Design a protein with these regions (language model features):
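Patatin-like phospholipase
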Residues: 1-263
Length: 263
């Protein structure tokens, strides 16, 4: 990462007005606060809410490592005087940092399969396995918050959009604004996709999955999708992301005010 990322370019982009701000979120293991470390334009002030706070700083690779440090799988990372872990932990408002940094549009890359959440539940013939239970617990931590926050944002947009500036000020909502969103979600379940790459796991891990019945149980790939870092699976994820984005190419170009592709 140190070889690939040039953090000095963040400073340059902010100085030139090309970048409003950049934030990286991690969870403080000492107090459980979701902490957003950021670099931004001078008018962006630090914020603090219940169990959420921000810290202006010079971003480094350490902030990235802390933000992606899955508990029990990767060690916590020390930033200043505290240790931090995965940014999705305790992040009840994942869209908030970008909005507070000045975003008026949010391009959201989801990891939860798109589709109707209210479709008929598949019939379960066996009790859930340990990895299946663990997978649902991880989904509750890493997936549910962004979907819930997006629904909240859509309700706020519906409230704010009909009002003009004077009406917003009279209602005490002068700082509120409509935030446009575009979500790109996987067209396939990552849990089921992960099951196709079980053979890439170390033998000891495959043995554990076999003994717990996880390989043959529908929906048991949830936990596996969080711990599978093998090349084949990662490459397939990138390919799926590209395919799903190209499937919405016109929506993406419209969202970013880009000219349509020529025929």
């Amino acid at each position: 990462l140190n070889d690939i990322i040039e953090f000095k370019r963040v400073d340059n982009a902010i100085a030139k007005g090309e970048l409003e701000g950049l934030g990286i979120t991690a969870m403080n293991y000492t107090n459980g606060h979701s902490t957003t470390f950021y670099q931004a334009q001078d008018h962006v002030k630090p914020w603090a809410r219940a169990h959420r706070r921000s810290v202006p700083c010079q971003l480094t690779v350490d902030h990235l490592m802390a933000s992606s440090a899955l508990p029990t799988l990767f060690p916590s990372v020390r930033l200043d005087t505290h240790f931090f872990g995965d940014g999705a932990l305790r992040q009840s408002r994942p869209l908030s940092p970008a909005i507070r940094l000045g975003a008026e549009r949010l391009f959201i890359i989801g990891v939860s399969e798109s589709g109707d959440d209210f479709e008929e539940d598949p019939q379960s013939e066996v009790a859930p396995t340990i990895p299946q239970v663990l997978g649902q617990m991880l989904n509750a931590v890493f997936l549910d918050s962004i979907q819930t926050d997006l629904e909240s944002l859509q309700r706020i947009n519906a409230l704010v959009e009909p009002l003009n500036a004077k009406q917003l000020q009279k209602a005490g909502l002068a700082n509120m604004r409509v935030i446009d969103t575009l979500v790109i979600s996987p067209s396939r379940s990552l849990s089921e996709l992960a099951r196709e790459y079980i053979s890439e796991l170390p033998r000891s891990m495959r043995w554990f999955l076999q003994k717990t019945g996880s390989i043959k149980t529908t929906g048991s790939g949830g936990a596996l999708s969080y711990i599978l870092f093998e090349p084949g699976y990662c490459q397939r994820l990138m390919q799926l992301g590209y395919e799903d984005t190209m499937a919405q190419a016109e929506d993406v170009r419209t969202f970013f005010n880009l000219a349509p592709l020529s025929a």
